[in-house]
Amino acid sequence: MTSPIDFDPARSIKTLPGTAHRYHSLPDTAALFGINLDELPFSLRPILEGIARNVGQNGVTAEQVQALGRWTEHQGTQPIEIPFTAGRVIMHDLSGTPAIVDFAAMRSAVQRMGMDPAIIEPLVRADLVIDHSVTMDNTGSPASLRINGELEAARNRERYAFLKWGAQAFKTIRIIPPQTGIVHQVNLEYLAQGYLNINELMVPDTLIGMDSHTPMANALGIVGWGVGGIEAGASMLGQPMQMLAPEVVGVELTGALREGVTATDLVLTITEMLRNYPGGVVGKFVEYIGEGCANLSLPDRATIANMSPEYGATMGFFPFDEISAGYLKATGRDGDLPLAFYKAQNMAWTPGQPLPRYTDLLQLDLATVEPSVAGPKRPQDRLPLAELGNVFRKAAAEGDRNPEVVTVTPMKADDAGIFAPLPERELKDGDIVIAAITACTNTSNPGLLIAAGLLAKKANELGMKVPDGVKTSLAPGSPVATDFLTKAGLQQHLDALGFNTAGYGCTTCVGNSGPLAPSIEAALQNHDIIAASVLSGNRNFEGRVHPDVDTNFLMSPPLVVAMAIAGNVNIDVTTQPIGQDASGNDVFLKDIWPSNAEITQTMQECMDPKAFRETYENSLDGPETWQNLASPTGPVYDWDPDSTYIQEISFFDGFSLETPKDALDNIAGARMLVMCDDNTTTDHISPVSRIRPDSPPGEYLISQGVAVDDLTSLGARRGNHHVMLRSIFGNGKARNLMLPGTTGAVTSYHPSAGEPAQMSIYDAAARYREEGTSTVVFGGKLYGTGSSRDWAAKGPALLGVRAIIAESFERIHKSNLVGMGVLPLQLPQRVTRASLNLDGSETFDLNGIDTLEPRGSVELTIHRADGSSQQLELLSRIDTSSELDQI
């Protein structure tokens, strides 16, 4: 093996045969270091190439090439620190707005120092796609797309003007306007070219994204994953991310999916399988390999990769192959050049070649997958389609209930044109009130959308209808879907069942389901009814889809249409009729389910590479509302102190280009601010839902003169820290176990003198800060699961929380906590917040912080109100030396 001292990356530069493209040869580098590339997982090879290519820059060393090259000796089970330098960054408007606010605030700070603000400029290309703000206000109408687009523009005028300013102020940030599509689908269909040109070299496409579903790009052989705003900001400034070389779990796929089984059924099966895998895959790479991969289209692979965060993995990676190249060509891009490049780099997979070595290798026969749904509260809770009714009945039977059947008051159309007339109807347990074809997981898959359209066509031709009161919507991930559904003659049949295109964005999947008919909402709020939603999304956490809908089931787009017709989830659609035709005859699911041959033939007739090119060329200018939007200009943003959307954040007060690192301090006499349950999501910690007038953020905004009708959502106001701080732990379904029986942002405040009092978390945190009392949060298993929401770390940090003590952490949120200076501390095995018998009256000391090492120990002392105390050792989840530098 070559001595690292002798390694010069320039010596491995070659020219790709038949082209003028130069590249850094990974096989040549591997030969120099004695690395057997064939044994190294495909997902690690682009990372190894990036380390080797960057030796001598930003502290990257040849020793790190050696370290990752020896991965096969330990399969990721040893804590080896390596750098990852992403080639580009993607983000959406909710996560990207705070990032641009941070860059704008840094420019303002630099200007106050008398320096050129333009020195604050991202060094890595970043694309921000506006996709998270369109709401399903109006659905089921030919005017829905226009109405929702106009409402989106009006509600977000100030925020969109700020983003437009950012596009002209920062050379390396591109803003992709609203109504273009969902960031991950736009990335897959347009932004990704299969490779990058960096410093005049052809390199593998690598990225990070400020959204947990960034791994959807893994389907195209792109190494990338979701991070929070803190890590993304550093990457945009060209800094490598330091990470531990991961374990890589291989999933060998064999066989093919059976007739009538969809990619959605497959990904729900994989999600269940990997969540039940001993040890889990949190913080690990999952790599799909084997002959079965050849039987999955690129969009099917994208559906699987998209749900990596739901099964817990950092990535769900498919190596680049002929299918990847074919997809690039089918969507209007060059596929031959990337394929030649990946073959030259030994990064392309060919069926039949020996498998690399993995930390563990699992097998899945695609022929064993069955029609499935997941719910009612977690994406990993897969169930066979036939069990849907049984599972709903079990969920509805929980708790002390008195189920009601309510007659809903008939309703006329409203003057604003949002709600259609609603005749009198009964509302009971299991009734579906939302049926949404939504989310990048499935709307990026033409086969699934065409299947939904074919099912709608058959149902429509039979005279079947969706019951009144079911809010139906179709929100494709890009306008390309509208093009092929229209060409196939299927959009008209979806329209007939109420699945009109209502927006291009994340919509219902991120909680932007919009209001239900007022009489429906009133019935759900005032009576004991457990209603349901069915959606083709990737998450169904409680309170996420709609605050009044308690059960939510994930399923494929054609099944969403079928269940909308059925109108209730308390049914076995495999044996019971889902409705009647125009003559009153029973119709079963099998009668209208399209065959694989029908789907394939329709795709061949309506899919066209030219449509992809033209759609994006025509849409990148944005709708008229975007083109006509006035915005500031210049390198420095003119902050408006009265703005309720965009505020200069206080992090950069006293900003210096040479900020000294403070020593870490031990913590004494801390109080518990919140005690969380298992599976506390970032939605629980920092919700993005509609702002209720009686909530702390709502009351604050009203006090600032904002009208109740203009409160909008917490997601839209992420650029205003005054609002966001009042929302922390404020999800209406979140439970603070310090106060059993309560939900939302309330806690028990224990003053240094006097009796405890119940108050908002924001007010309690403010009082603790005034007293000089540190605070901690206790959690359970998988603390911080869900979206890569930086405010779920920013918020607690700004409230004064010094440490989160939990049984386990999800990867992205743990990294965000570190980036915000909040210690993630892990309880010993078999010790839980419940076994510690905590109630909030205790105080806590944390010692060993001042001498902390990566994955070191911190001593926790619990002082109880009765004078007793207890000590135990916690594991610091500061995993790397670079994380220790951040904290």
Please report, for each region that a protein language model flagged, where it lies by residue:
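Fe-S-dependent hydro-lyases/dehydratases of central metabolism
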Residues: 1-886
